[in-house]
């Protein structure tokens, strides 16, 4: 996988401190932690309903010392923000055509040297859906990694 803000040592340390401060100042709490025996996993974060999900996920990721990668629609990776989005752990997804994303994700997780948590919104969109897409399941199955469930409760300020 590509180098990210989570794998940049000094920046990671500074942003962890900043994230913990932001959580405290805004009244948010991060509950739970990653299971200790899963350095690699697929994290499904639901429901994905707000543009604030990404910054809040990054903050929670720093607080939990995660090495996050996340999937986002291709349009947010366009210039001038594309390089920044990739450095934040983003992986562009073209939702308009089939691109073997599951197979590529499986290969990337298997090839990763260290810890890696791939965040996938199971709905595939911020809009209302009646059911989840299944890509996250097949990524985890193919990579032989666990699925970890996560959430953002904006009303109670819990993550």
What residue ranges belong to the model's regions?
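Extreme N-terminal tail/first-helix region
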Residues: 1-30
